[in-house]
A protein has these predicted regions:
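Short alpha-helical hairpin
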Residues: 1-14, 33, 159-170
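Alpha-helical bundle segments that constitute or directly flank the non-heme di-iron/ferroxidase center
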Residues: 13-43, 63, 112-122, 194
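Inter-helical linker of Solcar repeats in mitochondrial carrier family
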Residues: 18, 109, 175-176
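Secondary-structure edge/capping motif, primarily at the C-terminal ends of alpha-helices
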Residues: 40-44, 102, 125-132, 167, ...
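Active-site-proximal alpha-helical scaffolds that flank and shape metal-associated catalytic sites
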Residues: 48-155, 184, 188
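Long amphipathic all-alpha helical oligomerization modules
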Residues: 150-183
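Acidic, carboxylate-rich catalytic segments that either coordinate divalent cations
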Residues: 178-203
Length: 203
């Protein structure tokens, strides 16, 4: 909540170059994020799980095309820049860790790898908007905050949380500790992501 990237977005002072770099890196992150869903689907053992996971995967891809790519174009990011962009090593480390946990664990493990990113963005956006309502009206960054405080995004998050709660009802202590470790590591990776885009995105 106190990271300069999000606080400067909230008051409209974040240099546009930093946000452009963030959007490109986030786009690359999302490409791996959907692969993690695909890895989890392979572990699903009934049609209901497959239906839920496939729906989440389709929603993520759809949101990328409906919102993320048009947003990048409004920022002046060209198709050439999008296709030539390469993930920063911190971005790679994050998604590779998530994918490894999803591939080597079960459905619950895979869903926990996804939880931090989804949940933390909603939490950060909500708290920032509570503290600084004008953030929603900022010409450059307002729609970013609006997306993460929207009812549809909250509903999607709650579905993920409910699914994790249902699957974790009978796990043992060792498994619970491992899942907590995954969540904590993903929190740290997310913080490093903010640090990375703030440092690499120009002055």
């Amino acid at each position: 909540l106190c990271h300069p990237f999000v606080t400067q977005m909230a008051d409209g002072t974040l240099p546009p170059e930093k946000f452009r770099y963030y959007m490109l890196q986030d786009y690359l992150y999302l490409k791996d994020y959907v692969k993690i869903f695909a890895a989890i689907i392979q572990k699903a053992d009934d049609f209901e799980q497959i239906r839920f996971l496939s729906g989440e995967l389709a929603d993520t891809i759809g949101e990328t095309f409906r919102t993320h790519i048009p947003y990048m174009k409004r920022l002046g990011i060209t198709e050439e820049e999008i296709h030539s962009a390469r993930p920063h090593m911190d971005n790679n480390a994050y998604t590779h860790y998530m994918l490894w946990e999803a591939q080597t664990g079960d459905v619950l493990t895979g869903l926990v790898t996804l939880l931090n990113c989804s949940w933390s963005y909603a939490y950060v956006a909500e708290k920032i908007v509570e503290r600084c309502p004008d953030a929603l009206r900022d010409k450059r960054y307002g729609s970013w905050f609006a997306g993460y405080v929207s009812e549809s995004y909250r509903r999607t998050n709650q579905m993920l949380i409910d699914r994790i709660d249902a699957l974790s009802g009978f796990i043992d202590e060792k498994t619970a500790e491992h899942l907590c470790e995954i969540f904590e590591k993903c929190c740290l990776f997310d913080l490093r992501f903010w640090d990375m885009v703030y440092a690499m995105g120009g002055n």
